[in-house]
């Protein structure tokens, strides 16, 4: 029975990923056409099993854009960058903590039993580096698109830690603020998008 369920999950996942790849390509192409400051690199994350009950996540993110989507998507991107770059450290840190909480609330594994394992312990760069990334993004936003300048992806780490062993086959969900995002494991690669926000994952 377990082998049958695993086979079904693999087939379902292949179908989901085919749609996800098409959606991701469409979204990225649209971004390149519609935005002079479209990111040069898509968001990405690498998963690695650290132990039977722990999986690490190493993200490479267009972090100012992600934080904009989490904290103030209704505000114009340039206005968001300017207002947040000028915040006092205490207020800035409070907003980043709010963003981390928002990301963690929508990032998790779902086990075959239906139980959830949250992706927690998000580690973002320190306040000074984050603030500088906002200022650089604002300068880039005001530059002619012909320059081809862009902000390099920012490294962010997180971890899924369970009290019991995490099964080999799980369902992964990440926040839509990260989409489209390329997910990499030692044995697989696939896209998650706003329209395909979940995937069945076979952890090594």
Q: PLM features: residue spans?
A:
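Serine/proline-rich low-complexity intrinsically disordered segments, especially terminal tails, linkers
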Residues: 11, 28-31, 115
């Amino acid at each position: 029975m377990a082998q049958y369920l695993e086979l079904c999950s693999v087939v379902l996942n292949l179908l989901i990923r085919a749609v996800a790849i098409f959606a991701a390509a469409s979204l990225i192409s649209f971004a390149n056409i519609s935005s002079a400051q479209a990111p040069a690199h898509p968001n990405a994350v690498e998963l690695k099993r650290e132990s039977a009950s722990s999986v690490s996540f190493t993200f490479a993110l267009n972090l100012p854009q992600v934080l904009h989507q989490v904290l103030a998507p209704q505000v114009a991107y340039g206005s968001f960058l300017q207002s947040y770059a000028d915040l006092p450290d205490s207020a800035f840190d409070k907003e980043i903590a709010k963003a981390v909480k928002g990301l963690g609330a929508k990032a998790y594994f779902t086990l075959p039993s239906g139980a959830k394992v949250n992706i927690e312990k998000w580690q973002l760069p320190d306040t000074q580096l984050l603030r500088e990334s906002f200022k650089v993004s604002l300068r880039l936003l005001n530059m002619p698109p012909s320059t081809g300048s862009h902000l390099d992806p920012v490294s962010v780490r997180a971890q899924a830690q369970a009290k019991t062993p995490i099964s080999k086959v799980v369902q992964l969900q990440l926040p839509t603020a990260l989409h489209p995002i390329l997910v990499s494991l030692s044995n697989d690669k696939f896209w998650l998008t706003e329209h395909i926000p979940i995937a069945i994952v076979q952890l090594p």
